[in-house]
Amino acid sequence: VTKRNVVLITYDSLRADHCGHWGYERETTPNIDAMAEEGVVFESATAPASRTNPSMAGTLTGEPMVARDRVANPEHARNHLERHGTLAERFSAEGYATGAFCPNAYASKYYGFDRGFDRFEDFMFDNSRYQDLFEEHLGDSGFYTLLRNLRNFVFRQEAFKTWDSYIDEMVEWARDQREPFFLWAFSLDTHFPHLTPRKYREWSNLFDQYYYNWRCNQLIDEFDIDISEEEIQNIIDIYDDSIRFGDVLIAELRDRLAEFDPVIVVHGDHGEAFDERGLYGHFYPSLYEENLHVPLVVDDGETSGTVDKPVSLVDLPEIVLRAANIENGTPEEISHDWVVATDYDGRNDRRLTAIRSRRFKYLVEAADNDERRELYDLDADGREIENLVGAHEASEPLEALVDRRITHEEELLSIRSATEELGAD
């Protein structure tokens, strides 16, 4: 069986319910929708966490990342990726050329995401001496963030780097490789700030982009935002335009790499909140559907279908390896009765755990000695408003599952701590 070339496209902050194939009324994702018509759609795909760093660490290893520290500490992701091994390392072991183009700082070399890649371009400081100097003296300061953002704006790097500024590099890299190859393309276009070129703007204008990105910047670290429905809709407008622009990346890669007949896999790394419960974006961890439910579509030119049972993005390595003819089986055979999501809010010492079945979601949020438990019927209450804990027969079995998961995480952290102490001795 011939090993297939693979292109993995990750969209930052892309909600499933803002994609056309999931029923969205706007034509935001014509290329993802075309893939969905031809390939395999996972309708209940769930991110393992609500922010890029823990979500992608879990996605690329096949194991949720468990940590009790701020995301800014790179050691947790580095250790997790090393401990569990990455999809790129697996491809490399199978004789693949591996390349990544990822302008997201939280999935960069600094956090260890270059493991297994022959080439990893994160568009950060090219000179490591300057990188080390900045981090050593300014790394925890607001001044460092300001300088980095100014540099990013001038050179179109990190948060300001759109896919059209590096697609030539991706295509050139793929053409230079001996087949087979694995290419990971990360698009920040769907992440705040939403800077969509004029020709792709359908629902916003230039003023909207500047003003409502400024408003987003005001709201992003607020826990209980004060904003009108009209402003939220305007923010959604610039978000949807950015999705429409980001979606074009698929068409470009399919067209320019057509001779290699690659398997194409598209997914969001997590979602985005729009004041469903007082939050904007994903600055604060949240395990509700707006932050966890993501698109996941596989087009291998051979299999098609819809999977409505839950999958987690931690299933992505197995899905991709099957589509590439490395593992036995087909992608659509992968599903579960339930999946888990976990995250940690280091600012407020909030521990979040969720169990999601096809119909129900059970959430636990704990901080200090305070704990809140919630159960939602996603079929009847997709916006997760009516808490059914204790009032529905699904409460007891899902409570047992989530408690087992919480116990597992605490045991894992205890073992890890004890191991580190032994190593220190």
Locations of the language-model features?
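Catalytic domains that recognize anionic headgroups
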Residues: 1-425
